Design a protein with these regions (language model features):
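Membrane-anchoring hydrophobic helices of lipid-metabolizing enzymes
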Residues: 1-2, 7, 11
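Flexible, glycine/small-residue-enriched loop-and-beta-strand segment within the central core
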Residues: 9-20, 25-93, 119-120, 125-136
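Short-chain dehydrogenase/reductase
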Residues: 81, 99, 105, 115-117
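Conserved catalytic segment of ABC-fold P-loop ATPases
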Residues: 95-98, 111-113
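Short glycine-rich donor-binding/catalytic loop of glycosyltransferases
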Residues: 103-104, 109-111, 121, 127-128
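Leloir-type glycosyltransferase catalytic cores
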Residues: 138-145
Length: 145
């Protein structure tokens, strides 16, 4: 409901296993490897070139040769923001209100209400009252806006 998805948009199964909440925004080149379910909460935003991959393959060469694959669901909470170029791997959950920095590779669960970034993605800090005053480094919200 009231979602806005920029094109191009890519999904393995045409989004058949994708469950978006209301008011989800996705910038261009959102790629959903939806071999199993992907759940996205209300008011979540995706920057350009984000990939959510539910499928993976074994490290063991003999198993890959047999075309083995595993599929694990991804859960993205309510009101999250995933920056440009983020990659979320199979089985990961991201808690409500969290921000994932651009270029991060999310290999493990991220709790609610944090800023996380990096490769592998790690929690940098909690979202705090300071974030009500500053919208980005050194830039304050103005009462006149």
């Amino acid at each position: 409901e009231d979602c806005y998805i920029e094109t191009p948009f890519h999904a393995n199964f045409g989004g058949a296993h994708v469950h978006f909440g209301k008011n989800v925004y996705a910038n261009f080149n959102l790629t959903l490897v939806d071999d199993t379910h992907i759940y996205v909460g209300d008011y979540t935003m995706f920057g350009p070139n984000v990939t959510l991959a539910t499928a993976g393959h074994p490290v063991l060469p003999e198993l890959r040769e047999k075309l083995y694959q595993f599929n694990l669901p991804i859960h993205i909470g309510r009101n999250c923001w995933l920056g440009a170029g983020v990659i979320v791997l199979p089985g990961v959950s991201i808690g409500d209100n969290s921000v994932i920095g651009a270029g991060s590779i999310v290999t493990k669960d991220i709790p609610s209400n944090v800023v996380a970034l990096g490769n592998p993605c790690r929690v940098l800090r909690p979202i705090s009252e300071r974030d009500r005053e500053y919208y980005t480094k050194g830039r304050r919200f103005s009462e006149k806006q």
